[in-house]
Amino acid sequence: DAEIALEGISDESAAVTVKQLKAMDCHTIKTESTSDKIGVVKATGVWLSDVLSEYGLEQGDFSRITIYGTDEYSAPLYKDFLKENRIMLAFGIDGQPLDEDSAPVRIIIPESESAYWTRMVNRIKFEK
C-alpha cells in the first residue's frame, strides 16, 4: 500500500496510506477546476483537515503546505488559501480507482486552479 509522507506535523516521522485514508470518513464531491484542463469530476477521498485533526492540527495552523508528486511536481499552498479552501486527498475519480498516472492520491481543491490538483502524491510538507 502506497505511503504518503507527512513532514512537519509531528516530531516523529508521520505518514498515511491509501488503506488508512479509505478507513476514515470518506466523501464524494462533484466539482471542477477553474481552468479548462480537467473539467467536472466526481472525486472520492478524505479532507486533509480530517487527517490533520488526528494530530490535533488544522490547515490554518500552517503558513505553507507543499504537496509533492512522484514526478517531482510540487504545489505550494499558502496560509490565506489554506484558510479559504478545502483540500481533498482523493483516491477515486468518477467511481473508479485512480489510474497509474494519478495514483496513489490526487489532490482535489473544489473550484480552484487545476495547477493545485497535484497527482501521484507521495509527500506533503507542512510549515508553521
What are the residue ranges of the model-derived segments?
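N-terminal intrinsically disordered, low-complexity segments enriched in P/E/S/T
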Residues: 1-128
